[in-house]
Structure formats: structure tokens, C-alpha cells
A protein has these predicted regions:
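Short beta-strand immediately N-terminal to the catalytic nucleophile in serine-hydrolase-like folds
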Residues: 102-104, 127, 148
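Alpha/beta-hydrolase active-site loop
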Residues: 74-94
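Short alpha-helix in the alpha/beta-hydrolase fold that links the catalytic acid
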Residues: 157-167
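Short, surface-exposed "cap/lid" segments of acyl-processing enzymes
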Residues: 2-58
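C-terminal catalytic histidine-bearing segment of alpha/beta-hydrolase fold enzymes
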Residues: 169-210
Length: 210
């Protein structure tokens, strides 16, 4: 476990010879009971994606989970974005040649998408991403992006994700976009499907490591 400069925690080991790393970014946990704990709902959801990726890759892809402290709603996105950048800096300092994928849910999806332009980020998966008016996401040509959104999500709008998919395609990203029938923001109606889909996407990007 690594404590990053601003207090976020990064779970998982980074080896200097690591070839492929995925960082999981949870949604906002402001106001949730025990929101600074790994057992709070938002960080806990990402645990199952971590397990699915480890199993699917036969543990050849290093899986890290980032946990953001609860700093209050007004700063939840900018601080989470800063935490993710610190995680990328930490990884680059140990394994500068590693390819990195970001997988984020809700606010974590917004963070992951905001880092598409960072050349250290090889691929992005954004799950039910929180998208605000005025967000300007800039993908890179040829960059793989997975976008998934529950059709019944009432917290974030699946139509925004469809519009984003079209924008990223125009920017040259290789976008795989899906609206998941019957599911909601928590991704708990069809959890195994989400886990499998994300694991398959990540492993396909790092096929030489898997």
C-alpha cells in the first residue's frame, strides 16, 4: 500500500519490470458511511473488477486500486484528478516503460477520460461516466476507449456517453461503446457482465502481457 503525496492510497505493487498496469478509479463516495474506507460502496465496487482482470490475465497484468479521501463534494473531481496524476507519476517513477490503462466508474470515469490526452495512458475504460457541461475530453488518435452505461441509469445520463463516443471517434480514438440493457448506475443488475467485459477489454489491449 502506497500513500500518495495528497493522501490518496494506492493498493497493489508496481515492479520495475512491469509491462502492463491497470489503475482502477472509484466513483465519488462523498457522504457515504465510512467513505474513507476501502469497504465504502464506491471503492468496494472496483474490487470485483480487480479480481476479474487478475483472473482473465492470469495475473500477468498488475492491478492497482486508487482510493481517494473524502474531501467534500466541491472538490471531489479536481482532487480525484490530481490523485490519479500522482498515481501515474508514482508508476512512472518505478516502471517507466509500463503501459497503463485506466478503468473508472462515475466520477472515476470522468477522471479517466480527462487523462486520455496523457501520453502515459494507453487505454481508458469509463463506466457510467459522470459528464458535466463544459467538460472537454481530448483523446489521442488510435487510443482504445471502452464506454459502458446502464440503460436505466438515473444518476448519470447514458445519452451523454453516446454523444461522447461519437466525439472521441471523430478525434480518432478506437471506441467500443455499449448501453447495458436493464442496468443502473451501480452496475449491480448484471455485475458479472460488466466485470467480464472490462477484463476482456483490458486484456485485449495488453495481449503480449496476457
Amino acid at each position: 500500500m502506497t500513500t500518495l503525496p495528497a493522501g490518496a492510497l494506492l493498493e497493489g505493487d508496481v515492479r520495475p519490470d512491469a509491462d502492463a498496469i491497470v489503475v482502477l478509479l472509484h466513483g465519488a463516495s462523498v457522504g457515504e458511511s465510512g467513505s474513507t474506507s476501502w469497504c465504502a460502496p464506491a471503492p468496494w465496487r472496483m474490487r470485483w473488477f480487480a479480481r476479474a482482470i487478475r483472473v482473465r490475465s492470469r495475473r500477468r497484468i498488475a492491478v492497482l486500486r486508487l482510493r481517494n479521501p473524502d474531501r467534500g463534494w466541491p472538490v471531489v473531481f479536481p482532487r480525484a484528478l490530481s490523485d490519479a496524476k500522482e498515481a501515474l507519476d508514482h508508476i512512472a517513477g518505478i516502471a517507466p516503460n509500463a503501459r497503463v490503462a485506466l478503468v473508472g466508474h462515475s466520477n472515476g470515469g470522468r477522471v479517466a477520460l480527462s487523462l486520455c490526452s496523457d501520453t502515459r495512458v494507453a487505454a481508458v475504460a469509463a463506466l457510467a461516466p459522470w459528464i458535466e457541461d463544459g467538460d472537454r475530453f481530448a483523446g489521442r488518435r488510435g487510443q482504445p476507449v471502452l464506454l459502458m452505461h446502464g440503460a436505466l441509469d438515473r444518476r448519470t445520463d447514458p445519452r451523454d456517453t453516446l454523444e461522447l463516443a461519437a466525439l472521441l471517434r471523430r478525434q480518432g480514438c478506437v471506441v467500443d461503446s455499449e448501453t447495458v440493457a436493464g442496468d443502473i448506475h451501480s452496475m449491480l443488475a448484471r455485475p458479472r457482465y460488466w466485470h467480464r467485459r472490462v477484463a476482456d477489454f483490458v486484456v485485449s489491449q495488453f495481449s503480449s502481457a496476457a
